[in-house]
Amino acid sequence: MRLISTAFFEQDKFQPKTLVEGAYLALRNDIIKGIYTPSSKLKVDHLKDVYQVSGGTLREALALLVADSLVYAEGQKGFFVSPMSIKDFKEITQLRVILEIQALTQSLKNGNDKWEADVMAAYHRLNLAEKKLALEDIEQRNAQFFSWEERNAEFHASLVSACQSKWLLQFIGILYQQSERYRSLGVHYGTNLKRDLHAEHEALKDAALARNIPLCSEILAEHISITYELFENLPESVFSGKEALAQA
């Protein structure tokens, strides 16, 4: 069973059909939100009570998360949250730029009227979410972040939705999911406050609808790369989870 291939596009619409799928999605979201720190052990006996499933069901969910590289298994020691590092994030960012530009190029060539309408609708929903972020105080803004993240995923997915390569889209989905972990981490350090996300997304939308492939590719590459650049000077302890543990 593979779920992540479509998670990038429909993570907020997906309705789990089995207990394994439900546990997988719940644990996946909690890892991305940083509830479980990088490299921390995921204890089956504890987590089966948290997610109200059997040990066997939870192990199946963890196996799916291993395939997504959000969790790793170590011999007889059990399951652990995958580590994070600035080096890892740099590689994720570089690969996202390469693959998403390829998909964007295909999408802008293939997109029809429905594609344009989907891009406009996704942009409108994202714009509304961004306005909520701007109006709230810091604590409320952080609480709104994950709602914004869903709209952000929808918008990025809409841009490449006319790409006809399922493999390209699947790998983009995996990388996007990994980058979510870092953006979630950035909430606690105010990295998103140092940029004008609305202006970036508006420029991306306008270039896409104009079918200007060179300009849209340039804007997308810069948009993705800025996120990494805002993390470059953070201490490594932020990514290892040690700083979070020290503050607990």
Predicted regions and their residues:
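Short, flexible turn/loop "capping" segments at secondary-structure junctions
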Residues: 72-73, 152, 196-197
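Short, flexible helix-adjacent loops and helix caps
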Residues: 32-36, 104, 108-112, 131-139, ...
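A ubiquitous short alpha-helical element
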Residues: 85-90, 108-111, 139-144, 184-191, ...
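C-terminal all-alpha effector/ligand-binding and dimerization domain
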Residues: 2-4, 15, 181-248
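Conserved amphipathic alpha-helical segments that form helical-bundle/coiled-coil interaction surfaces
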Residues: 102, 114-184, 199-210, 215-225
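Short linear motifs at protein or domain termini
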Residues: 1-109, 236-248
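Amphipathic alpha-helical repeat elements characteristic of tetratricopeptide repeat
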Residues: 21, 97, 120, 195-199
